[in-house]
Protein backbone atom coordinates (compact mmCIF):
# COMPACT_ATOMS: atom_id res chain seq x y z
CA UNK A 1 0.00 0.00 0.00
CA UNK A 2 1.39 3.38 -0.96
CA UNK A 3 1.81 5.56 2.11
CA UNK A 4 3.90 8.41 0.70
CA UNK A 5 4.98 9.97 -2.58
CA UNK A 6 8.19 11.99 -2.85
CA UNK A 7 8.28 14.44 -5.76
CA UNK A 8 11.68 15.72 -6.84
CA UNK A 9 11.51 18.84 -8.96
CA UNK A 10 12.68 22.41 -9.44
CA UNK A 11 11.01 25.82 -9.56
CA UNK A 12 12.38 26.49 -13.06
CA UNK A 13 11.04 23.18 -14.46
CA UNK A 14 7.84 23.46 -16.54
CA UNK A 15 6.93 19.75 -16.34
CA UNK A 16 7.43 19.93 -12.55
CA UNK A 17 4.84 22.71 -12.30
CA UNK A 18 2.41 20.65 -14.39
CA UNK A 19 2.98 17.66 -12.12
CA UNK A 20 2.37 19.81 -9.02
CA UNK A 21 -1.12 20.63 -10.34
CA UNK A 22 -1.76 16.93 -10.96
CA UNK A 23 -0.58 15.97 -7.46
CA UNK A 24 -3.10 18.40 -5.94
CA UNK A 25 -5.78 15.93 -7.07
CA UNK A 26 -4.22 12.96 -5.23
CA UNK A 27 -6.01 12.37 -1.93
CA UNK A 28 -5.22 10.41 1.25
CA UNK A 29 -1.50 9.97 0.52
CA UNK A 30 1.29 12.08 2.01
CA UNK A 31 3.13 14.00 -0.71
CA UNK A 32 6.55 15.44 0.03
CA UNK A 33 7.93 17.93 -2.50
CA UNK A 34 11.71 18.25 -2.70
CA UNK A 35 13.40 21.05 -4.66
CA UNK A 36 16.57 19.58 -6.17
CA UNK A 37 18.24 23.00 -6.14
CA UNK A 38 17.82 23.25 -2.36
CA UNK A 39 18.68 19.74 -1.18
CA UNK A 40 22.11 18.19 -0.60
CA UNK A 41 23.74 16.56 -3.60
CA UNK A 42 24.42 13.39 -1.63
CA UNK A 43 20.65 12.88 -1.20
CA UNK A 44 20.14 13.20 -4.96
CA UNK A 45 22.94 10.72 -5.54
CA UNK A 46 21.58 8.32 -2.91
CA UNK A 47 18.12 8.46 -4.53
CA UNK A 48 19.61 8.30 -8.08
CA UNK A 49 17.87 11.53 -9.14
CA UNK A 50 19.30 12.56 -12.52
CA UNK A 51 16.26 14.19 -14.13
CA UNK A 52 13.18 16.05 -12.93
CA UNK A 53 10.40 15.59 -12.19
CA UNK A 54 10.65 12.24 -10.42
CA UNK A 55 8.00 10.60 -8.26
CA UNK A 56 9.03 7.92 -5.78
CA UNK A 57 6.22 5.84 -4.29
CA UNK A 58 6.72 4.29 -0.84
CA UNK A 59 5.11 1.61 1.28
CA UNK A 60 6.38 2.73 4.67
CA UNK A 61 10.11 3.22 4.13
CA UNK A 62 10.35 0.84 1.16
CA UNK A 63 10.50 2.33 -2.34
CA UNK A 64 8.09 0.33 -4.48
CA UNK A 65 7.78 2.32 -7.70
CA UNK A 66 9.23 5.34 -9.51
CA UNK A 67 8.23 7.54 -12.44
CA UNK A 68 10.15 10.15 -14.42
CA UNK A 69 8.49 13.04 -16.21
CA UNK A 70 5.15 14.81 -15.88
CA UNK A 71 2.98 11.70 -15.63
CA UNK A 72 -0.80 11.89 -15.79
CA UNK A 73 -3.24 11.58 -12.92
CA UNK A 74 -4.39 8.32 -14.53
CA UNK A 75 -0.85 6.92 -14.34
CA UNK A 76 -0.52 7.93 -10.68
CA UNK A 77 -3.91 6.43 -9.83
CA UNK A 78 -3.00 3.20 -11.66
CA UNK A 79 0.16 2.89 -9.57
CA UNK A 80 -1.79 3.53 -6.37
CA UNK A 81 -4.39 0.89 -7.34
CA UNK A 82 -1.68 -1.60 -8.31
CA UNK A 83 -0.21 -1.49 -4.80
CA UNK A 84 -3.48 -1.55 -2.79
Question: Which ranges hold each PLM region?
Answer:
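Structural micro-motif
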Residues: 47-58
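Non-catalytic, surface beta->alpha helical segment in thiol-disulfide oxidoreductase systems
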Residues: 56-84
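Structural microenvironment flanking redox-active thiols in thiol-disulfide oxidoreductases
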Residues: 36-44
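Hydrophobic beta-strand anchors of alpha/beta hydrolase catalytic cores
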Residues: 5-6, 31, 55
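Chalcogenol-based redox active-site neighborhoods
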Residues: 21, 46-47
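Short alpha-helical
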Residues: 14, 38-39, 71-74
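Domain-level signature for proteins that mediate thiol-based redox and metal-cofactor handling
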Residues: 29-35, 48, 73-74
